Amino acid sequence: PAPYKGGNPNNVLIIGDTHEPFCKEGYLEFCRDVQEQYDCGTVIHIGDTVDNHAISYHEKDVKGMSAGDEWNMAKAKMKRWYNTFPNVKVCIGNHDALPFRKVFTAGLPVEWLKSYQELLESPRTWEWDFVHQVNGVIYQHGTGMSGEMAAVNAARENRQSTVIGHLHTVCNTRFLASYKDLIFGLTVGCGIDHKAYAF
């Protein structure tokens, strides 16, 4: 789909974990439709843009793709996201960070790796960072968090409203209120194809 022109920068489209090349068919089009429906001028990818299943620390499917084949397919699929959403703030997720973790495990200097932008051939208008703030709300992937209360616990720790992804089976909003403020923790859904061998 063609990029959405315009949009209110105060309206934020959150793209859930895509885990390319294992994203659910039609998820990109769904996100683009939501962007237009709600006039979203700010786009945030909550992280785990790619899966990196072949280099995961978890057990792998021996009949799955090689690391090179998976990487090339993931990069090809990510180009569709770049074309549809040219300006994105990306929260680096645990799967995005796997190449850096593997370099650390091997005892190699992290400087030997390229940046996320270079690795995934993303446009310069995709801003890669672990945390982004938009209108007083923190957006982070949620690495290391778990359970129904993960996002509201993150909001409590951050002392401000917080949005996370990471938890494929949780999608909720919880609130914390005091005499001084009201903050929320939001866990967004994800765009994975749960039938793919990687899951």
What are these regions (language model features)?
Residues 3-13, 132-138:
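Beta-strand-turn-beta hairpins that frame and shape the catalytic cleft
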Residues 4, 35, 154-155:
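Structural motif
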Residues 7-9, 39, 84, 135, ...:
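Residue-level preference for short coil/turn positions at secondary-structure junctions
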Residues 11, 15-122:
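Core catalytic region of metal-dependent phosphoesterases/phosphodiesterases
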Residues 13, 89, 123-128, 140, ...:
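General small-molecule cofactor/ligand-binding pocket signal
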Residues 87-96, 129-138, 171-172:
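Short secondary-structure transition/capping segments
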Residues 117-134:
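Short acidic low-complexity segments
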Residues 136-199:
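Conserved beta-sheet core of the metallophosphoesterase superfamily
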